[in-house]
Structure formats: C-alpha cells, structure tokens
C-alpha cells in the first residue's frame, strides 16, 4: 500500500518559472539557497529567470555557480528582458551573447517594457539569438499599459514570435492586472484561445497566494505561471494539487478543481 499526493487535474503539465531576485526577502537565492530550493522543489520548477540586471549586478563567479546548480536540476535559466532592453538602448545587443554564454545562461527574454521594437526588428533579434543556440522567451506587454490587452493582437504576436523562434511568450503581469480590473471577461476568452498553451502568465509575488489561487481557479491547475518567487514554488505546486487554504483544500473535492 502507498499513500500518494493528490494529482493535478486535467491534461498536460503547467509550467512554473521562478524569478531569481538574488539575495532578497522573497527568498534567498545565493548559491546555498538555490541548492536548498532545488533539493526541495526542483522537480516542480521549469525555468529560473535571472532578475533584471543581475547578470551584470551579481559577481560572475557566484552567479555561474547558481546557474550551474539550476542546470544540474534540469531547470532552464534565462536572463530578464530588462537586460535586453538596456543592451538595446546602449546599442550593444550582440554583447549579450558572450556575456550570457560566459555565465552558462542559455536563454534570454526579449521584452518591450521601456523600448519599442518594430516587428521586423523584434523577429530579427529572436532569430539572431536562436541562431546562436539561445532559447528565447518573448514578453508581451508593458509595465504601465494604457488600455486592456487586445486578444487578436496578442494572438498575432504569439504566432509571429513563435514562427521567428521564440519557444514561449510571457504575458506581463501589469496587462493581466489591468484586464482583471476593467474587463475580466477578456481573461475567460484568453483561456479558450488556441495558442493559450504557448503562453505563461505572470503573477505578482506580493499577492501570493490569493492571486495565484485565483489564476488556478480561472485557468485550471495546469496554467503556466511566471514570476514565482523561489519561496513560493513549493506552495504553488500544492495549490495546483488542491492543497492549501487558498484553494479551500480542493483535493477533497477533486470534481470541483478546474481542469
């Protein structure tokens, strides 16, 4: 006889991307902190985003060891989009390739929070990094959006950047927050979009676990989520399985847990 964990409901497996802030109140992620995190929750983490400018801010030797620890646990690392945007502003995008390779980071995020890329330029950079064996994630949206997201526009961008070589699209947290306040029906339509499995939705670490439980309730246990603080990764997996007050211990009523 064995006693097993409750399973996630539905098909597939939603992805989890943590955001590695470095030493921070959201979860210490120095070398030993990352090793402890991965020993406990590594099996539930797919990606680790190296926060903002940390590829430059954190000394290279310890950061390389952190990246190597993630790689050993089969967690893919990628640099945050702010680093790309800064390099683009400085006219030094190509300098990212040797910097990231030297650190062992094999992925990067391309975003447009504080810069604008025309579609041809965006797709060219995605292809440029793919040709150099980087995995590329594109982030859709801005940190201060002016109006609710247009699903047709988002769908077109997902299709275009996937064709250019991006393997996933992250939807900026601020875009989701604005939609939730102004027209939550858009989120219901988003869940039915044929390209929904190609995106990760950013969550707000400061709104854990309420917002995360709400996203699971709205999109299902296998929704792919990004921006997860390291200290929240294990509890998030519990929420996905119906464990915790945030989901009212739905493991006891599995028929009520969204697929």
PLM regions with names:
Residues 37-41, 70, 99-103, 129, ...:
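Generic structural signal for hydrophobic
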Residues 1-67:
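Conserved N-terminal beta1-alpha1 strand-loop-helix module at the mouth
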Residues 1-7, 19, 29, 52, ...:
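N-terminal and secondary-structure boundary signal
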Residues 12-32, 51-56, 78-92, 139-153, ...:
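Active-site mouth loops of central-metabolism enzymes
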């Amino acid at each position: 006889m064995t006693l097993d964990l409750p399973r996630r409901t539905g098909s597939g497996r939603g992805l989890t991307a943590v955001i590695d802030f470095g030493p921070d109140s959201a979860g210490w992620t120095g070398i030993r902190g990352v090793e402890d995190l991965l020993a406990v929750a590594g099996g539930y983490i797919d990606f680790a985003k190296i926060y903002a400018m940390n590829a430059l801010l954190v000394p290279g030797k310890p950061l390389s060891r952190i990246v190597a620890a993630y790689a050993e646990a089969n967690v893919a690392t990628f640099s945050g989009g702010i680093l790309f945007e800064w390099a683009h502003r400085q006219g030094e995008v190509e300098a990212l390739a040797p910097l990231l390779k030297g650190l062992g980071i094999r992925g990067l995020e391309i975003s447009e929070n504080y810069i604008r890329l025309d579609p041809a330029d965006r797709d060219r950079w995605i292809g440029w990094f793919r040709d150099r064996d980087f995995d590329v994630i594109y982030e859709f949206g801005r940190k201060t959006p002016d109006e609710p997201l247009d699903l047709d526009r988002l769908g077109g961008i997902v299709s275009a950047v996937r064709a250019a070589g991006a393997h996933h699209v992250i939807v900026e947290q601020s875009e989701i927050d604005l939609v939730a306040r102004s027209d939550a029906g858009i989120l219901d339509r988003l869940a039915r979009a044929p390209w929904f499995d190609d995106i990760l939705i950013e969550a707000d670490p400061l709104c854990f676990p309420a917002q995360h439980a709400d996203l699971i309730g709205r999109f299902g246990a296998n929704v792919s989520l990004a921006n997860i603080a390291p200290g929240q990764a294990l509890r998030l997996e519990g929420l996905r399985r119906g464990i915790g007050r945030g989901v009212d211990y739905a493991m006891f009523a599995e028929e009520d847990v969204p697929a």
